[in-house]
Regions:
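Catalytic toxin/effector domains delivered as secreted proteins or via bacterial secretion systems
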Residues: 2-103
Length: 103
């Protein structure tokens, strides 16, 4: 599919469309897709940068997140070693596994 009829195109973070260089981010963003409008020549970043040049916020990530982002963060608590996780814990495990599979 050709991108010619579209006014905006996407490029990765390695391709710089700005005239001034920024330092790399301190943390890896969830997305590294920025938008460049070829008609106006404006570059819209999905990250907010501080005065020191470091990115401190990725606009695609939420401010508040669930405490169980990773499978290893879920604690089983004190239980017998042969006891299986309950329904809520299984649900959290599956959710964390799905979330980690896209990274």
């Amino acid at each position: 599919m050709s991108r010619k009829p579209y006014k905006q195109f996407h490029h990765g973070k390695e391709i710089s469309k700005t005239t001034y260089g920024r330092k790399p981010m301190k943390w890896f963003p969830w997305t590294y897709v920025d938008t460049y409008n070829a008609d106006t020549g404006r570059f819209r970043s999905r990250r907010k940068f501080g005065t020191d040049g470091w990115a401190y916020k990725d606009l695609d990530t939420p401010d508040n997140h669930k405490p169980y982002d990773h499978v290893h963060d879920i604690q089983k608590g004190k239980r017998a070693p042969d006891r299986k996780p309950n329904k809520q814990e299984r649900k959290e495990f599956e959710k964390a596994k799905k979330k980690r599979s896209f990274l």
